[in-house]
Every structure is written in C-alpha cells, then in structure tokens.
Amino acid sequence: MAAEASESGPALHELMREAEISLLECKVCFEKFGHRQQRRPRNLSCGHVVCLACVAALAHPRTLALECPFCRRACRGCDTSDCLPVLHLIELLGSALRQSPAAHRAAPSAPGALTCHHTFGGWGTLVNPTGLALCPKTGRVVVVHDGRRRVKIFDSGGGCAHQFGEKGDAAQDIRYPVDVTITNDCHVVVTDAGDRSIKVFDFFGQIKLVIGGQFSLPWGVETTPQNGIVVTDAEAGSLHLLDVDFAEGVLRRTERLQAHLCNPRGVAVSWLTGAIAVLEHPLALGTGVCSTRVKVFSSSMQLVGQVDTFGLSLYFPSKITASAVTFDHQGNVIVADTSGPAILCLGKPEEFPVPKPMVTHGLSHPVALTFTKENSLLVLDTASHSIKVYKVDWG
C-alpha cells in the first residue's frame, strides 16, 4: 500500500499541474483564475471562460459589446456571469495548489534545466500561429498566423515592431501561411498553401518575389548557411533547394534534393554541420492513423539517421507525435511533441536516437521552435497563441 501511495504521488502532482494549466488559467492573459474580483472566471454567452479583467478590456466602453476572443460570437460584458464550476474547482484544489509553490521551492530545477522565463503574444496579438523564425542580424522574432496581416515581427522584448502581408487573393497577399524563415540578409520567406507558392518580402514588408507553379504544396521552409532556401513539398513528397538573388528578386536555380519522401512538412538545417532534418507524416496503411518520422541527411544528402513514432515509443511510455524539428548549437536534433506535450532532444544524427526530455511542463500544442544566439529556446504554442522563451537555469 505504501509503495502504491508513493507511486501515485508524482502522478497526482502531474494531474494537479495539468489542471492548473488547462482549466484554472485565463487563456487570454494567462493569469490564474481566483476569487479576487479581477481574476474571477466569467462565462461568456458562447460558453467560453475568461477572467473579469479581460472582459473589461475587451468590452466597448459605452455599449459593453464584445466578441469572444476564441469563437468571435458577439455578447455584452453585462451579460457575463461567474463560472461556478471553475470557482468550485479552485476551492476543491485550493489546498493542493497552495502547497505547489512550496513543493517547487523544496525541489528546485536541476542545474542546466530549461525553464520558461518569458511569454509574449497571446490571443488577438496572434491568431492560430503556424510558423516561427528568428532574424540572424536583428534578433527579432517573426511569426506567421491567421490574422488580417499574416506576418508579425516582434522585438526582443516581445513587443510588436511591425506587421505586413495582407490576407487576400492578390499575388502579393498571403492566403494561408504555413511556415516562415529569415535569410541572412533579412528577407522574409513565407510558404503559402493557399495558392501553393513561396513569397519573398524584404524586412519592411515589400514583396520581392513570388515563386508559383513549381510546387504541389510547399510546406516547411528554412535558410541554409550559404543563404539558400530549402523547402518541403508535402504533396509531391520532395525536398528542394532554391538559389535566389534576394536583392534583385530573381530565382536563379531550383534543385530537387530528395524525392519519395512521405508527406514531408517541417525542415531544419544545422549551421554547425550543414545536416538537414525532415519531418515526415506517413499514413499507416489500413489504419488511417498518421504517425511521424524524423529523417536526418548529411550536407551531401546521405541518410545518416531516422526514427519514427514507434521507435520513440521504445524509449517513452506514451506516444510521441513530432510537430516541429530544429537543431541546437551543438548539432543535436530537437523536436516538439504535441502528444506530451513536450520538447525532446534526440541527440546527434550519428548517435540517433538518444532521446531526452528538455521541456515537459507549460506547453499546450507546440508547432515550431528555434534557438537564439544566446541559446534560449523559442517555442511557438498555437493553442495559447503565444511564444514561450526557455532559458537554461544553472541553479
């Protein structure tokens, strides 16, 4: 019995933490719900729940009209009501939640662990974001999302510095952005699944080049150390290298690096070794279930390592569903897992795989990730419409 109790302790703590993140937090401002007036959970007429402070911020000052930030249904601030189930849950879990900070202080993060130091974005600032990139010169963060202007640029502090890329059907507009990368000379490259093209902008949002008619469904995009562009074609099952004169807005050459890939989506390039990682989404025959597979190629495009959902299940008790891939500064392959959700290190390609969890808390649905020059990890969480900045805690 004592053994069962000791085993259930971590599981119970994990359940409490998950409840606190998923149920007891306002998904607009990310503050914890509580009994204080500004933090009280309020039901909107559509059934979604936000805190009273966000209701006040969203409502028109005279008419009190507002739109639900999640489903856009119209309602009025005066028609909201306390969400009693959430308030009751706070009371039921109150003692355990009050003990949680003390428990965290008693067991601090191990030296070298990644901890979330900063979050920016949020619903309204970002809407269903899909791609993330970091400018190598300015350090600014570029995100593509489903807002009226599809490309949003943030400064290092998380403030919105600029946005462009109108939603529309014109050649220079962006219909459905999937991924984004920044070239070494600060050009913004976006894959647009809406018209199956690749669009190149300067850093101020002026269109420089539209590459259309060559891809069935362009998806992942990344910059190489030589300032080339690699792009996956999910429908054609191929990987391409584009040589572009960005200053003149001219496509010089297109080279197909790989064919016969299975629904390739995410792609990453190691600036240390030149290796290329591709994230595939093969469909299991007869099941309709989509798994994921990470393939790593050398700079000469020789396959040096691969691992799929089944292979990772030999290391972890739960299913791993990779949604994004990148390299760290040491050449390790890093993936985002939406089933966990978590961030995992798979090790170096020649040792593939040596999986190790890096981030296991505080994520909802990570879809993109990248490292800064200072070795901070940026994670794009589409469920919370935000960018989360993780740094190494040396204790």
UniProtKB/Swiss-Prot annotation:
Q: Where does the UniProt annotation locate this protein?
A: Endoplasmic reticulum; Nucleus
Record field: catalytic activity: S-ubiquitinyl-[E2 ubiquitin-conjugating enzyme]-L-cysteine + [acceptor protein]-L-lysine = [E2 ubiquitin-conjugating enzyme]-L-cysteine + N(6)-ubiquitinyl-[acceptor protein]-L-lysine
Q: Which InterPro entries match?
A: 6-blade_b-propeller_TolB-like, NHL_repeat, TRIM-NHL_E3_ligases, Znf_RING, Znf_RING/FYVE/PHD, Znf_RING_CS
Repeat (NHL) positions are: 113-157, 161-204, 205-245, 248-300, 301-349, 350-393
Annotated pathway: Protein modification; protein ubiquitination
Q: What is its EC number?
A: 2.3.2.27
Q: Does the keyword Lipid metabolism apply?
A: no
Any one GO biological process: proteasome-mediated ubiquitin-dependent protein catabolic process
User: What's one GO-annotated cellular component?
Assistant: endoplasmic reticulum
The UniProt keyword set, sorted, is: Autophagy, Disease variant, Endoplasmic reticulum, Epilepsy, Metal-binding, Neurodegeneration, Nucleus, Repeat, Transferase, Ubl conjugation pathway, Zinc, Zinc-finger
Query: What effect is documented for mutating D146N?
Result: In MELF2; severely reduced interaction with EPM2A; increased levels of PPP1R3C and glycogen
Name the consequence of S22R: In MELF2; does not significantly alters the subcellular location as compared to the wild-type
Instruction: Give tissue specificity per the record.
Output: Expressed in brain, cerebellum, spinal cord, medulla, heart, liver, skeletal muscle and pancreas.
The molecular function terms in GO held by this entry are: ubiquitin protein ligase activity; ubiquitin-protein transferase activity; zinc ion binding
Q: What is its main location?
A: endoplasmic reticulum
Please give one Pfam family short name: zf-RING_5
Q: Which domain of life is it from?
A: Eukaryota
Going by the record, the broad EC class of this enzyme is transferase
Give the RING-type zinc finger regions: 26-72
Entry's free-text remark on domains? The RING domain is essential for ubiquitin E3 ligase activity.
Concerning PANTHER family, the annotation shows:
E3 UBIQUITIN-PROTEIN LIGASE NHLRC1, E3 UBIQUITIN-PROTEIN LIGASE NHLRC1-RELATED
According to the record's subunit comment, the protein's assembly and interactions are:
Interacts with AGL. Interacts (via the NHL repeats) with EPM2A/laforin. Forms a complex with EPM2A/laforin and HSP70. Interacts with PRDM8.
- Illness the protein is tied to: Myoclonic epilepsy of Lafora 2: A form of progressive myoclonic epilepsy, a clinically and genetically heterogeneous group of disorders defined by the combination of action and reflex myoclonus, other types of epileptic seizures, and progressive neurodegeneration and neurocognitive impairment. MELF2 is an autosomal recessive, severe form characterized by onset of progressive neurodegeneration between 8 and 18 years of age. Initial features can include headache, myoclonic jerks, generalized seizures, and often visual hallucination.
Question: What name does the UniProt record give this protein?
Answer: E3 ubiquitin-protein ligase NHLRC1
What organism, scientifically named, is this protein from? Homo sapiens
